[in-house]
């Protein structure tokens, strides 16, 4: 590894460096500081944080695969995908609307799926007991 050492010596040794005054600095020096009677105004910018919109895709996929009562799980999955698409585009209001519909459909699919599962267990038991 080669190290090159360079030393720089000032050209005008013993004399202060000659500075050029910029035009703006010269105007400020001649005119002085501006005197405004009004206080300086400030601008406030509100940046909205990323609003988290749940799209319920996993829940819809579960209902589609396991409890697809009256195709509610599949329809909920379609609305969940639409909600995710709206969220990616930046349309938070549209994403919330589709997510709300997907949530309602998922709730109904879950309730009807549980109800039908219970009926599929109870009805054969009752039929077997009635035959005895």
Curated annotation (Swiss-Prot):
Q: Does the keyword Transmembrane apply?
A: yes
- Induction statement: By IFN-alpha, IFNB1/IFN-beta and IFNG/IFN-gamma. Down-regulated by p53/TP53.
Q: Which residues lie on this side of the membrane: Cytoplasmic?
A: 1-56, 78-106
Keyword tRNA-binding part of the UniProt annotation: no
Q: Which residues carry this modification: N-acetylmethionine?
A: 1
Q: Which PANTHER family does this UniProt record tie to the protein? A: INTERFERON INDUCIBLE TRANSMEMBRANE PROTEIN (PTHR13999), INTERFERON-INDUCED TRANSMEMBRANE PROTEIN 2 (PTHR13999:SF8)
**What's its job?**
IFN-induced antiviral protein which inhibits the entry of viruses to the host cell cytoplasm, permitting endocytosis, but preventing subsequent viral fusion and release of viral contents into the cytosol. Active against multiple viruses, including influenza A virus, SARS coronaviruses (SARS-CoV and SARS-CoV-2), Marburg virus (MARV), Ebola virus (EBOV), Dengue virus (DNV), West Nile virus (WNV), human immunodeficiency virus type 1 (HIV-1), hepatitis C virus (HCV) and vesicular stomatitis virus (VSV).
Name-wise, this protein is Interferon-induced transmembrane protein 2
Gene for this protein? Answer: IFITM2
